Amino acid sequence: LLLGLLCGLVNAALIHYTGISPLVITLGTLYLYGGGALLLSGMAGATGYEGIGGFPDSFTAFANLTFLGLPIPLVLFAVITVFFWLITHRGRFGRHLFLIGQNPRAARYAALSVNGMPYALYGLVGVASAIAALVMVSYFGSARSDLGRDLLMPALTAAVLGGANIYGGSGSVIGTALAALLVGYLQQGLQMVGIPNQ
């Protein structure tokens, strides 16, 4: 979780100090972090698609647990979705973030922390990404460097379908969550009938 937080803060720092579009920075650091994961995997002695394994049974069983009849990954997804919905759509923090995304100059004139607030948001997103990574590692039973590689386009599709503006300033957490579920179910359905999901 701390590594996810650190990666999010690095993204925020790069966006802040370079002035490059957040989408470009995020895609660039995707490959940077992927290379780091490949390096760590090689240092741990994992070869090919084997990944780092040998996790305790309690950890690998976590992704298959249920809570009130619902799978734990779905429960975590719902909890994280509600958390981000509350902070972005029901509080001052979210209103300030949307204003910073729409018009940073006006936000600066309104005495908002234009430089500090994105650090908080990217840090939170980094922690949420780390939670998702832990669930995936628990589900597959190994930490592979390429585990989330095929999720880039579905994630971007879900964000855009959910109403997010790729240039910032607008979006809906609930809409994006519903779009992510829709894209995921479409992928699974296509695989079940034998159609490639690319």
Which ranges hold each PLM region?
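Helix-loop-helix "hairpin" substructures at the membrane interface of multi-pass membrane proteins
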Residues: 1, 5-11, 66-143
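Alpha-helical transmembrane segments within multi-pass membrane transporters and channels
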Residues: 1-30, 178-183
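Transmembrane alpha-helical segments in multi-pass inner-membrane proteins
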Residues: 8, 122, 129, 139-198
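Helix-loop interface residues and adjacent transmembrane-helix termini in multi-pass membrane transporters
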Residues: 17-19, 90, 116, 167-170, ...
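Transmembrane helix-bundle core of multi-pass membrane transporters
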Residues: 22-91, 117-119, 139-148, 195-197
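Hydrophobic/aromatic residues within transmembrane alpha-helices
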Residues: 32, 106-107, 160, 182
